[in-house]
């Protein structure tokens, strides 16, 4: 373990093994990280400090560097998390969840009650988390009002009930004012309210109300009736807003922000948004969140989690966790709407003026090129208009003039075709062309601009370094300008996604053409029908027979296609 000397020199002597490293100021860590290869990762920190303000602060504020070698990357991950929670370093985001968000705990006692707790190490059933603590306390109060679970802890033996009984918040099991059977039904009803599983408990409540009415216990009848109304209203709400799974957390990365949606009882119950300084922080935020919070049965992300992180989450859950990339469409829209909010217009004006020397543009067009080893070369044009992405203005281009790998020529064709449409007045003139790439792509954009006479500012954005290249030769470190980074990063990522999806669609169509041309009984007319109605051959073979007959296709052709696919 290295203990003395300058940080830069220590980095050069780091081992090429998995482990955890600690940048320290005095005896206190200011940043803790893990790596599969310690030396390689530390050299990345050193290089990034030349242009990234956070990395520069870590290096410049450190006077010592230590590391701990582990047997594998998973051990390094576990150790990293424990050390971050222990030392809470200044530049780590993982520790910033404190003791976790509030949860509701249905205790495991003879007469259970409901409590607001933090963390996951508790005896009983946990519900939540609640990202706003006041909401947890409101639900707790509702449960006491409706089901009168005891409010004292621990359960004392009294001869007279406390004030909460007289306020209608407690059924006073301490005084024997409620039977064990009656109290258990109240607990079941409270659980049903928290889980949304009301079908089983409602018949029991109806039986109880009938029993109380026969015994002329009308006050208890009214109390049970209130419980029934609350649970039936809950069931109605679920029928309208039900999602395709009961419980899950959804993490959605959108530009430089990470959204979190909590789904419980098939309903969206909470949302949270985290601003990220770098892509590396994504997994750190998730690990920090689950260090202190409940892990549900399903975790959904629109990005890939490392196997080490998945393993750690499973171990934290002490049970099965399903990882998925399939986000329900309705929730994706909620996430994008919320993650797109919050751009400070004053800061945006300042960053455009200071860094790019221009006012905030009304229209930005983003471009990218995609191909598959030189085949199906396509280009994308996405449009940012009035502060948000305008999907109705997106356009895709199939490159016609080249048939080999040459991104520059492909880009030149796409930009030229776009410029002609702009100059003809067919589309609104943009203020900026933002091209995914480096200096080479920038030069192509400048060349097309000059040749066509189009009045537009041209920038390119390099993915790895997140650097904007300008026409006057400047290089702007985008991560140092978070609002500009969010806008340009979103446009660049969307252009990349749109180009890639079109490339895949063309490849799939070519694959379909190849298979269908080999099957007897499928002529040109039927091919056109299949292309028009089915995106892939797998969609075709999954289609119902009635649908195929309606399209004039014999369902037996599905079996022929299956043979070729297998």
Curated annotation (Swiss-Prot):
It holds the Pfam family GIY-YIG. The keyword Ribosomal protein does not apply. GO terms for molecular function: DNA binding; excinuclease ABC activity. SMART domains: GIYc. Keywords: Cytoplasm, DNA damage, DNA excision, DNA repair, Excision nuclease, SOS response. Residues 16-93 form the GIY-YIG domain. The keyword Repeat does not apply. GO terms for biological process: DNA damage response; nucleotide-excision repair; SOS response. Residues 199-234 form the UVR domain. GO terms for cellular component: cytoplasm; excinuclease repair complex. Gene3D superfamilies: 5' to 3' exonuclease, C-terminal subdomain (1.10.150.20), GIY-YIG endonuclease (3.40.1440.10), UvrC, RNAse H endonuclease domain (3.30.420.340). CDD domains: GIY-YIG_UvrC_Cho. It is found in: Cytoplasm. InterPro entries: GIY-YIG_endonuc, GIY-YIG_endonuc_sf, GIY-YIG_UvrC_Cho, RuvA_2-like, UVR_dom, UVR_dom_sf, UvrABC_protein_C, UvrC. It comes from the Bacteria. Interacts with UvrB in an incision complex. Belongs to the UvrC family. The UvrABC repair system catalyzes the recognition and processing of DNA lesions. UvrC both incises the 5' and 3' sides of the lesion. The N-terminal half is responsible for the 3' incision and the C-terminal half is responsible for the 5' incision. This is UvrABC system protein C. The lineage of its organism: Bacteria, Pseudomonadati, Aquificota, Aquificia, Aquificales. The gene is uvrC.
